[in-house]
A protein has these predicted regions:
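Helical catalytic core of nucleic-acid polymerases
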Residues: 2-5, 15, 22-23, 48-58, ...
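Basic, short loop/linker segments at the boundary and entry of helix-turn-helix/winged-helix-like folds
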Residues: 1-31, 344, 348, 352
Length: 425
């Protein structure tokens, strides 16, 4: 690895005293510890004093936990550059196919408990709860003449009033900012659906994995619980990272959670990207769906399941209808409840959406490899490397922490492919 391109910075020190630690040695220390599931700065500090392998790797460095934590905080750009340098090396070793990648996301818990995540509705309940307590304490004071009991009740009353005021102020602030949810410890984290656990306060970690050797090429962290809006963003980053040209389109596999018209249109406009996205089921389970109506591009008409022709209505909205045929159609109850009959909307991007459906069907066998391709790295990150929650706070810092985990996974993957002597050579 070319250390000069990483641009790690030394820890800032006073004019007197020992010189700062070598940042490359600090970086090696982080990779070793993450590789072995040691993540917190205090645990790393302990290992630096007793772990023989780590003492050898770092030339006997024994930094304290604050220095260790500050290195990660002060070298965000350098850590991201290191990830990109890893990918460049893996590409040189021909470990990246540059033909097919799979994109998926997983929820990683934030350093913010569910208790410290509030919504307007939750605040209303808390305010009501403390209001009831205040009334109860006032009632007890009016009925109690014993000094010791009175002092205890007054103390509880004071705390209840303070809590009520705190929640009312927080509610007013949230309403002023126009937000319905707020995390009190990590302000960027959000409550999200977590597999098998209902909901939790978390971040949405996105990875794109190359099909050849399961190397994570691109990674990102989002605050949006849904994967929608992430398709083109991740596909574009991956194409840029791998220097894909328009002559060699990159096939991107993604599940139905990424199906979004705007993203599919952007992918279609970018000739470097060939998006194969699972098609979600249409809303509603009863009656005929839009996909049951066949469009004839030459005649600009739709043919319904009953064989009737729907022509374009002369108006601003591109609707295709046939009120007369619908009125006497025996399948009307299965098709629509509208008195005017069934209307099919065809917007300007309908052709792209139809080609996306066709592309998915034509590449279904390739799409089936998506799950084992992209889920495998997430399993390794969580089960083997212990990456089930973030230790840092705010989006900027958790992105940095995520890069370290992804580099560790990629290193672990490469060491399973090559023997160490081969890799050193």
């Amino acid at each position: 690895m070319d250390e000069s391109v990483l641009k790690f910075t030394h820890s800032s020190t006073k004019s007197t005293g020992r010189p700062p630690y070598n940042p490359i040695s600090m970086f090696k220390m982080y990779l070793y510890c993450y590789f072995n599931g040691i993540r917190s700065s205090r645990k790393i500090e302990r290992e630096c004093k007793r772990n023989i392998e780590l003492l050898w790797l770092t030339n006997g460095l024994t930094p304290d936990h604050k220095t260790i934590a500050n290195f990660r905080k002060d070298n965000k750009k350098a850590i991201e550059s290191a990830h990109k340098e890893f990918i460049r090396i893996f590409d040189k070793l021909k470990l990246i196919g540059k033909e097919v990648v799979a994109i998926d996301g997983t929820k990683i818990r934030a350093d913010n408990s569910r208790k410290n995540n509030v919504t307007i509705n939750k605040l209303n309940k808390l305010i009501e709860y403390h209001d009831e307590n205040i009334h109860e304490y006032l009632k007890q004071l009016s009925q109690n003449d014993i000094a010791e009991s009175t002092d205890t009740i007054k103390s509880k009353l004071k705390k209840a009033r303070e809590k009520k005021q705190e929640y009312e102020s927080l509610k007013a602030q949230m309403e002023s900012d126009g937000i319905r949810e707020k995390s009190l410890i990590d302000p960027d984290s959000r409550r999200m659906g977590v597999a098998n656990k209902g909901t939790d306060v978390a971040y949405n970690v996105q990875n794109s994995v190359d099909a050849k050797e399961h190397i994570i090429v691109t990674t990102d962290v989002a605050t949006n619980p849904a994967d929608q809006t992430q398709l083109y963003a991740m596909a574009e980053k991956t194409a840029n990272e791998l220097n894909i040209s328009e002559d060699e389109a990159l096939t991107v596999l993604a599940d139905k959670g990424y199906w979004r018209k705007d993203d599919l249109v952007e992918c279609d406009n970018d000739k470097r990207i060939n998006a194969v996205v699972s098609v979600p089921k249409e809303q509603g389970t009863k009656g005929f769906r839009k996909s049951d109506f066949i469009y004839d591009e030459d005649k600009d008409i739709y043919t319904c399941p009953a064989g009737n022709t729907l022509t374009r209505w002369k108006g601003k909205t591109p609707n295709y209808t046939n009120p007369k045929a619908c009125k006497n159609c025996p399948y009307k109850d299965k098709c629509t409840k509208s008195k005017r009959g069934r209307a099919i909307l065809r917007d300007e991007h309908e052709e792209i959406m139809e080609s996306s459906v066709k592309r998915y069907k034509d590449n279904y066998e390739l799409y089936r490899s998506r799950q084992q391709l992209v889920e495998h790295p997430f399993g390794t990150l969580k089960r083997s490397l212990g990456f089930t929650y973030f230790l840092t706070r705010t989006l900027e810092n958790v992105k940095n922490e995520n890069f370290l985990h992804v580099m560790t996974y990629n290193l672990k993957r490469v060491l399973n492919i090559f023997r160490v002597p081969e890799l050193v050579e």
